[in-house]
A protein has these predicted regions:
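C-terminal alpha-helical interaction appendages
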Residues: 1-58
Length: 58
């Protein structure tokens, strides 16, 4: 089931809003590619944090 801005894994609750939105985008793409949720969540988390760091550097 795809994740939305209102329905996403508990582990994403503490991400910044833009990080969480990116994690949802990445996670949904991984699910569409056939990744199971238990693998898609940590991959999407890591990639979203990396994306945020690269796009919001001071």
């Amino acid at each position: 089931m795809p994740w939305t801005k209102n329905d996403y894994p508990d582990s994403w609750k503490n991400l910044k809003k833009t990080e969480r939105e990116k994690a949802i985008e990445i996670g949904n793409a991984l699910l569409k590619e056939g990744y199971p949720e238990d693998r898609a969540i940590p991959i999407a988390t890591s990639k979203a944090e990396e994306w945020y760091k690269n796009h919001h550097a001071a």
